[in-house]
Amino acid sequence: MKAEWNTFPHLCHTPNGDISIRVYCYLPKGQTNELPILFYVHGLGGGNKDKGNGAEWLSTFAEEHHHVIVAPAFPRDEFPSEFYQLGTISASMDSYVPVAEEFWIYNNIEQLFDRVKGMLASKCETYKIFGHSAGGQFVHRFLNAMPDARVSRAVAANPGSWTFPVADGKIDDTGNVYGWPATVKDTPLADDRHLKSFFARKMLVELGEADIKSLKETYATGSGGTTFMNLPGMCAQGDCRFDRGMTYWKRAHEYAASRGFACNWELLRVPEVAHEGKKMFAAAIDWLLSD
């Protein structure tokens, strides 16, 4: 591969058959086999855009901070919400209907890491991952679902919904109990192995303090296949992305403490930034580089 944007196909195994996607990979100038690898996971619709719609600032980051960028593109028409944001863990968007683990979309990240390592003869043993909006939904569910994933640092920025890592299904103090996709209750992700691994991750919960547009209004009609965003368990998280993120942060820490699980997550509140992927990425750079 050349020192610029490269692209190659990748075959995803899904419950609906194999689907070919494009993967974009940026190589900075110079020797790349010892450089860290960063996965960029696009937001909703980003899979229909060149390099997930972040080509300019991702390549600038790669050159300035000497990283290889890997950006898989999952087209929205072939990877609707239950495939992309929810990871194909369940065959339903409003309850848990088991899907074989071999079809979970998250497997593709690990497969792509191995492919890129092979292409570059890379010495990297781990990788970093950043996702904004729907990409942030992807990232935090990916970490919960894949306890053996070789991730060193992960950023979940401004997700519109969260799956709470609480086996009891309780999001708040009301006593109401919610299942998938609002929580991991009664799913494989609720066992101690998955939860301990997830809480132990170096994950940044990154929230734009100005990302306060009402999601109940935005997704009132379930536009774009996002009906799950206004399920009761999602609405219980809050009315806007910032509120939902803060509810997630608080409840997850309470639950981890109650179970005696160590939690290595960090919270970054970004002032005066709304639903803006470029600005959120810029605000997370220091944390991504802090190893």
Please provide the spans of the model-predicted regions.
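A domain-start/cap signature at the N-terminus of enzymes
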Residues: M1-I37, D50, E64-V68, D94, ...
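C-terminal catalytic histidine-bearing segment of alpha/beta-hydrolase fold enzymes
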Residues: A3-N6, E206, T218-G233, D243-D291
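The feature captures the conserved acid-bearing segment of alpha/beta-hydrolase catalytic domains
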Residues: S152-E254
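Alpha/beta-hydrolase
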Residues: F39-V41, A157, V270
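Conserved alpha/beta-hydrolase "nucleophile elbow" surrounding the catalytic nucleophile
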Residues: H42, G131-S133
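Alpha/beta-hydrolase active-site loop
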Residues: I89-L120, Y127
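Short amphipathic alpha-helices and their capping/turn segments at secondary-structure boundaries
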Residues: C25-K29, L58-T60, D186-L204, I285-L288
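Short substrate-entry loop that stabilizes the transition state in hydrolases
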Residues: Q31-L35, Y40-P80, T163-F164, K213-L215
